[in-house]
Amino acid sequence: MWPGLVGKGGEGAEASIDLDKMLDYTAKAEVNGVKFDGVDLFLYNPHVDIDITDDGIKKLAEKIQSRGFVVGTVVAPVWFDGSAMGDATQRANWVSAVRKACRIGQKLRDLGVRPYGVVRIDSAAPVTAWNKDPKGNTKLIAKTFREGGKVAKDHGERLAAEGEICWGGMQSWKYMIQTLEETGMPKVVGFQADMAHTLLYTLGYNAPTAHRIVPQNYHWEPEAFHKAMKKMTAALRPWTIDFHVAQNDATVKASGDHEKTGKHCLATDPNGKLNIARDAGYWMRDDASKVTKKFQHICWDGCMFPNDVMGKQETWNNILSAMIQVRENHGWRA
């Protein structure tokens, strides 16, 4: 539900879209009789207050169930007064946001509305600050991630770090792996792969030249693309516990108070570099092309679209159509 909030509501940005409207957009989508099963939630106002009461969580569950939905992954708002790489207070605030998100996630499970999903996190640290001491800052981020991981484990949750080029210690595929390995909690703290963001990993944005996988004179030749995707996903897939279906035109975008990160495109964008139905398989299948069955749901991520685009039913139907194709190609039954 975060596309209704991310990059919106700030000075000079479009108004945010409330949760009820986002749920209604989702509920109205239908392709050949198939509808969305549920939603992932951003635990941030005006959608969901991170300090929501138990009664409020019950009302939230009822609101979602009334539309025939379940909840999957929830996003912990770790950025505003927290950072996994900050001072003691900022790091404590980061862990506090994770604790509160885990509480909400656990309550939703107890209420029977959340059968699967994880808690999404990131380092909440700028790349420029991380660059001043890469080794020391990676160790500090990992230490904070471990503290968050212990909290998650106590709540029966797992944490998934979403790899984006805008977060320190997570801005390249190699740095992301280093951070996860340093954290050292593979059963609790893993990776959230977003098709749009990870595409930029292959191009080496915000990272040393050695982290770029494709050739310098790359022009999207199929063989080079395939080789790069195979190499990246082989390295990150063992850590991957949550997945975002998405499209990207290989550019970056910022909106409102959100830093430049991988640009999400509409599912049908002619400039999109991904074949969504095919390329999801790099993440959902292993090196032998066998379905991994690593996660029980997949989620569409498409942030910073104009509100008029968000208000078109065609937008949601096209997203659902892409999701159905991914499930048909790489899905599994429990």
Regions found by a protein language model. Give the residues of each.
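N-terminal pre-domain/capping segments
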Residues: 1-115, 135-136, 143-153, 227, ...
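Histidine-acidic metal/acid-base catalytic patches
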Residues: 1-31, 103, 110, 142-143, ...
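Active-site-proximal loop/turn and secondary-structure-junction residues that shape catalytic pockets
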Residues: 3, 43-45, 77-80, 123-127, ...
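Short acidic/His/Gly/Ser-rich catalytic and metal-binding motifs that mark active-site loops
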Residues: 73-74, 81-83, 127-130, 200-202, ...
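Active-site groove signature of glycoside hydrolases
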Residues: 105-134, 155-166, 299-300
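Active-site region of glycoside hydrolase catalytic domains
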Residues: 151-156, 189-190
